[in-house]
Regions:
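Short, low-order "capping/linker" segments at domain edges
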Residues: 163-177
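Mixed-charge, glycine-accented linear interaction segment located at domain edges/termini
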Residues: 124-157
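Extended, positively charged loop/linker patches that create polyanion-binding surfaces
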Residues: 52-135
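Single conserved hydrophobic/aromatic residue that forms the stacking wall/gate
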Residues: 1-10
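A positional/architectural concept
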Residues: 7, 16-41
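Short, charge-patterned binding micro-sites
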Residues: 36, 42-59
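A structural signal for short hydrophobic beta-strand segments in well-ordered beta-sheet cores
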Residues: 12-14, 38-42, 91-93, 119-120
């Protein structure tokens, strides 16, 4: 893998004996293990991932390792973001301290707390974003928030990702006249 990010933006460290990669940048630091079949080296400004042969498993692991390291570099330099929106009459969100408070038609408000690595940004009453440096963690947190009230297929009410298309169903057919 050839990483094109500048060396002065982030610091990287590879421990070949423990099969770990550590990346530090302005948005934090991330560590990751990689498969023992792969070889990861730092050469100048680049992180180089090589595979021992062209077997299917080695090719798959090569792409996985390269992508994971790339996501780590992007995460510590730029960060990741998932934008979500709320649709439905009376549904809304607000931020109280470090908690996201969701009013979703339940008898009680649903509260979701920020973590050390995940931040929540509320744009308005119907739009909010999940921010962080770890792509997997941001996606998992966004999925957990979305699961509090996923979009239903009849009216489309619920929490959805911005740009997500929800397949709508037709309601009950009326009695024939």
């Amino acid at each position: 893998m050839r990483s094109s990010a500048a060396s002065d933006v982030y610091k990287r460290q590879v421990d070949e004996a423990a099969h770990t990669v550590a990346v530090k940048g302005p948005k934090g630091s991330l560590n990751s293990n990689y498969h023992p079949l792969m070889t990861v080296k730092v050469e100048g400004n680049e992180i180089l991932v090589t595979r021992p042969n062209d077997e299917k498993e080695a090719r798959s692991l090569h792409g996985l390792t390269r992508t994971n390291i790339h996501n780590m570099v992007v995460g510590v330099t730029e960060g990741f973001r998932k934008d979500l929106e709320i649709q439905g009459v009376g549904y809304r969100c607000a931020k109280q301290g470090s908690k996201l408070v969701l009013t979703l038609g339940f008898s009680h408000p649903v509260e979701v707390a920020e973590t050390e690595t995940i931040k929540i940004e509320v744009k308005d009453a119907l739009h909010f974003s999940i921010l962080g440096s770890d792509k997997q963690e941001v996606g998992q947190f966004a999925a957990e928030v979305r699961s509090k009230r996923p979009p239903e297929p009849y009216k489309g009410k619920g929490i959805r990702y911005v740009g997500e298309f929800v397949i709508r169903k037709e309601g009950k057919a009326g009695k024939g006249k």
